Amino acid sequence: MTRILVTALVGAVLSGGLGYLLIPMLRALKVGQSIREVGPIWHNYKAGTPMMGGLMFIAASIIVLLCNLPFMADYSVFYVLILSLCFGFVGFLDDYAKLRKKQNEGLTSIQKFLLQLAVSALFLYIMYRSGAMSTEMYIPFFGISIPLHPIVYIFLSMFIMVGCDNAVNITDGVDGLSSSVTLPVMVFFTAAAIKQGKYDLALLPASLVGGLIAYLFYNWHPAKVFMGDTGSLFLGGVVCALAFALDMPLILIFVGFVYICETVSVILQVGYFKLTHGKRLFKMAPIHHHFEKCGWKEEKIVIVFAAVSAVMCILAWLGI
């Protein structure tokens, strides 16, 4: 337990220190965020804010895990890390494309989807072949697991992982939102891994607990840096990979409740717009922008959404 706490503390120190060095470098390289033309007009002042700030907590988590390597008995945490880094690399490609085009549209949706699908398939196959993952679907609150054919499990899981990864990305639309919502999720997975006796696996979410707290000092409104798709897709990868590594993918319904609401709001908005030939269900989607248009300040949105995430994580804990 002491090692877990030290890991979180070191993750915070490293992430904070890296942020202090990284942000001036990003400014010097003019790695600035472009604002979508269809986005909220009151976000225009954020144009030019350095992005790819997710490299802070990504690098911190890598360093922490490598430092713990001599003391590890179970290396499955590196499967989770590698998957997350691959998702983060997809995000990096997207961020890089945005910088080259000097607009807020990077990779096409189909390019991102195919890359994420390939990464998910490889991760699930390796986890299954190594015996680090079961093909039984655990049902929260009922304490039962339903066995599935490996092929069915892997194909179903691929789409869950891609959906989860993109949902975390969609949530990253207000200063401090994605990191604040993900923070209690990382606390949950740290505790869940400890409960299962998977102390080495708990090191990654523990390092991100510290890393995200430090990142929030730079990302709280008004943000000095954005995590970019590099950071948000990395976090999405960690969230879904941990759920599968702990054999509880359906727990994402609870711990990922805010992510799901954000994604569903977009789907409903688009569907309603097409069905009604131009009418909108929300003032703007994702739903955090709807609340902005209702007059909520960014800080209020972050606090409320993070509180909902924390409550749902507590509920998820009661179900395992």
Pin down the residues of each PLM region:
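Hydrophobic alpha-helical hairpins/lids featuring a short glycine-rich hinge
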Residues: 71-73, 77-108, 112-113
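Internal, non-catalytic "lid/hinge" segments that mediate substrate recognition, gating
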Residues: 107-108, 118-132
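Alpha-helical transmembrane segments
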Residues: 1-27, 57-89, 123, 127-130, ...
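Membrane-interface helix termini and inter-helical loops of multi-pass transporters
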Residues: 100, 131-145
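Juxtamembrane helix-capping/reentrant segments at transmembrane boundaries
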Residues: 36-49, 102-116, 287-289, 293
